[in-house]
From Swiss-Prot:
Keywords, sorted A to Z: Cobalamin biosynthesis, Methyltransferase, S-adenosyl-L-methionine, Transferase
Protein name per UniProt: Cobalt-precorrin-5B C(1)-methyltransferase
UniProt similarity note: Belongs to the CbiD family.
Gene Ontology biological process terms in this record: anaerobic cobalamin biosynthetic process; methylation
Catalysed conversion reaction: Co-precorrin-5B + S-adenosyl-L-methionine = Co-precorrin-6A + S-adenosyl-L-homocysteine
UniProt xrefs under InterPro entries: CbiD (IPR002748), CbiD_sf (IPR036074)
Pathway where it operates: Cofactor biosynthesis; adenosylcobalamin biosynthesis; cob(II)yrinate a,c-diamide from sirohydrochlorin (anaerobic route): step 6/10
Organism field: Burkholderia vietnamiensis (strain G4 / LMG 22486) (Burkholderia cepacia (strain R1808))
């Protein structure tokens, strides 16, 4: 086979959060009301001081005030809102201050445990502060002493929200307006990890003492059937086992069950906290060594090292009477126990590709 010269990858492109989109559009709409200026782009200042220019799809007056919209660009790590129209409708008010409202496609908080009170629009604290800072500065520039009513919406947001964890978190009717830095960093997965933390916090605030952190749908179904847990207690951790364990170290619960496919659990057992293939791989020689520690023959060890997949290695071990699923779960449990406080009861479950339990440890 001839060698090929690998192409040099282009730098990954950053994007902007829905919070940045909301800030840009609310500022543009308010500027139209106070200054009579309809811009096709607007500059905003991000929380860490960077200045960015965001293009607008429209900026126009309405019967109640003004509105502006922009297309959410998540850069080279597109999320569920990538390409969606985020818009702001702004009305002036005699009462000072900035009041936020959920427009079409933006959800409302209905459960305790989030950073916002029940009944509030799901516009997170940092985006609220970004909008308030920009609107206050605009008001001062124009000598305006009144306030602003700001309604944020996302076109199609109610349907998009069904692809997120919002329904499980108790955010109904649409998406959340998010962001802590204003920037979407490619493959940072910050939003996903934040949703894991929120899921744990919401469960705790609603009196749930036992959660199950699951790598996917099959493991979630297995935990739901095994324990009869409500959806609010089921945490979709994906590949981010470390996000669950480290959050529990900071904010413990009474009990956590972790469940995943055998291959994923074997990565955790080997000490990897990010189970994605970009960051960790299945170590067949290590599985063979663990089998050897349990009395596996030399022939079985060799067959396991030569296996094509972890599932094949598991099948070989079980056929020879070696409880590899339990062994892997026991090692994964030790990794977890090194992170979470002793007050947290931890247990591990491994499933096969049919969703059947093939190992456990507690």
């Amino acid at each position: 086979m001839r060698d090929e010269t690998p192409e040099q990858p282009a730098p990954l492109r950053f994007g902007y959060t829905t919070g940045s989109c909301a800030t840009a559009t609310s500022l543009a709409a308010a500027r139209l009301l106070l200054g009579g200026r309809a811009d096709d782009a607007v500059e905003i200042v991000l929380p860490k001081g960077q200045r960015v220019m965001m293009r607008l799809e429209f900026c126009r007056t309405t019967a109640a005030g003004a509105e502006a919209g922009t297309i959410k660009d998540a850069g080279d790590d597109p999320d569920v809102t990538h390409g969606a129209l985020v818009f702001a409708r702004v009305a002036l008010s005699a009462a000072p201050g900035v009041r936020f409202h959920a427009g079409p496609g933006v959800g409302t908080v209905t459960r305790a445990g989030l950073t916002l009170p029940i009944g509030e629009p799901a516009i997170n604290p940092v985006p609220r502060q970004m909008m308030t800072t920009h609107l206050d500065a605009l008001a001062a520039e124009h000598g305006y002493t009144g306030g602003f009513d700001v309604t944020i919406g996302v076109e199609g947001g109610e349907a998009l929200a069904l692809k997120t964890m919002n329904p499980r978190l108790g955010i109904v009717g649409g998406l959340s307006i998010l962001g802590t830095t204003g920037i979407v960093r490619p493959f940072s997965c910050a939003a996903y990890i934040a949703s894991i933390h929120q899921g744990i916090d919401v469960a705790r605030a609603n009196g749930i003492a036992h959660i199950a952190a699951c790598t996917g749908n099959a493991s979630e179904d297995a935990m739901r059937a095994h324990y009869g847990l409500p959806d609010i207690a089921l945490i979709e951790m994906g590949d981010f086992a470390g996000a669950v364990l480290k959050h529990l170290r900071r904010a413990p619960l009474a009990r956590v069950s972790m469940c995943g496919g055998f291959g994923k659990l074997s990565k955790l057992a080997a000490g990897h906290l990010d189970l994605h293939s970009r960051h960790s791989s299945i170590d067949l020689p290590l599985l063979a060594q663990w089998a050897a520690d349990a009395g596996a023959s030399d022939a079985l060890q060799a067959a396991m090292r030569a296996a094509n997949t972890s599932q094949e290695a598991l099948k070989l071990a079980l056929a020879d009477g070696v409880p590899l699923g339990d062994i892997v779960c026991a090692h994964a449990l030790r990794v977890a126990r090194d992170i979470v406080p002793a007050s947290v009861a931890v247990e591990m479950f491994a499933i096969d590709r049919q969703g059947r339990f093939v190992g456990s440890a507690r």
